[in-house]
UniProtKB/Swiss-Prot annotation:
<feature type="binding site">
    <location>
        <begin position="114"/>
        <end position="117"/>
    </location>
    <ligand>
        <name>ATP</name>
    </ligand>
</feature>
<dbReference type="GO" id="GO:0000287">
    <property type="term" value="F:magnesium ion binding"/>
</dbReference>
<dbReference type="GO" id="GO:0005524">
    <property type="term" value="F:ATP binding"/>
</dbReference>
<keyword id="KW-0963">Cytoplasm</keyword>
<keyword id="KW-0460">Magnesium</keyword>
<dbReference type="GO" id="GO:0005829">
    <property type="term" value="C:cytosol"/>
</dbReference>
<feature type="binding site">
    <location>
        <begin position="174"/>
        <end position="175"/>
    </location>
    <ligand>
        <name>ATP</name>
    </ligand>
</feature>
<comment type="pathway">
    <text>Cofactor biosynthesis; biotin biosynthesis; biotin from 7,8-diaminononanoate: step 1/2.</text>
</comment>
<keyword id="KW-0093">Biotin biosynthesis</keyword>
<feature type="binding site">
    <location>
        <position position="53"/>
    </location>
    <ligand>
        <name>ATP</name>
    </ligand>
</feature>
<dbReference type="InterPro" id="IPR004472">
    <property type="entry name" value="DTB_synth_BioD"/>
</dbReference>
<feature type="binding site">
    <location>
        <position position="19"/>
    </location>
    <ligand>
        <name>Mg(2+)</name>
    </ligand>
</feature>
<dbReference type="GO" id="GO:0004141">
    <property type="term" value="F:dethiobiotin synthase activity"/>
</dbReference>
<feature type="binding site">
    <location>
        <position position="53"/>
    </location>
    <ligand>
        <name>Mg(2+)</name>
    </ligand>
</feature>
<keyword id="KW-0436">Ligase</keyword>
<dbReference type="InterPro" id="IPR027417">
    <property type="entry name" value="P-loop_NTPase"/>
</dbReference>
<dbReference type="Pfam" id="PF13500">
    <property type="entry name" value="AAA_26"/>
</dbReference>
Length: 226
């Protein structure tokens, strides 16, 4: 066991496939013999008494841990986290998340933390996801939802990550628009400009099993100079 390491997964927007990629990353690391656990510090959007992202991350983890460590804050409405928390009469506390993360690091070799929404999403009145990543001391992996406009969103996000002096350790192209024109050219444009390794390209198919998708990710490239 011992103190594990890990990454923070952010995306170019909400709904770009962060959970899909995080689960695939967990399976990829597990395939190398590591103990892995996914964490969703703040989940917003309850369906039938469950938070789907949290369920998927727990299922993709290969050790059993307390649910409140995987997901310290579970908010019912699928809206911006700080607004959902405010409506519930609570304030998201980064120290609570940090302590939960420490507990996971004691138990797993790799902890992969999935953010809420995009990189600059507020978590309370004075802190955002940037402050959370800094508090956890993690490098960022960027999920680019491949659709028209994604180049701008990806470069803006990369700029924000680096402006906060946080390492950008890799990116994943996740195809979310099957009709996207000049797909390959967009991937190439991002490869040329993001200045971090492309870990893989995930196809458009909502039914893909995360374990199958994991074979499309080259985790050995994480953190390499591109």
């Amino acid at each position: 066991m011992g103190m594990g390491k890990g990454y923070f997964v952010t995306g170019t927007d909400t709904g770009v496939g962060k959970t899909r990629v995080t689960c695939a990353l967990l399976h990829a690391f597990a395939a190398t013999g590591k103990t892995v656990v996914g964490m969703k510090p703040v989940a917003a959007g309850c369906e039938n008494g469950m938070w789907p992202d949290v369920e998927l991350l727990a299922a993709a983890s290969n050790i059993s841990v307390q649910r409140e460590h995987i997901n310290p804050y579970a908010l019912v409405p699928p809206i911006a986290p700080h607004i959902a928390a405010d409506r519930a009469g609570i304030e998201i506390d980064l120290e609570v998340i940090r302590q939960a993360h420490l507990e996971l690091k004691k138990k797993a070799d790799i902890v992969i933390v999935e953010g809420a929404g995009g990189f600059l999403v507020p978590l309370n009145d004075h802190e955002d996801s940037v402050a959370l990543v800094q508090a956890l001391g993690l490098a960022v992996l960027l999920v680019v939802g491949m659709r028209l406009g994604c180049i701008n969103h990806a470069l803006l996000t990369a700029h924000a990550v680096r402006a906060a002096q946080i390492p950008l350790a890799g990116w994943v192209a996740n195809r979310i628009d099957p009709e996207m024109a000049v797909f390959k050219e967009n991937v190439l444009a991002l490869e040329q400009r993001l200045d971090c390794p492309l870990l893989g390209i995930l196809p458009y198919d909502q039914n893909h099993d995360a374990r199958d998708l994991s074979s499309l990710l080259d985790i050995a490239r994480i953190g390499m100079s591109s």
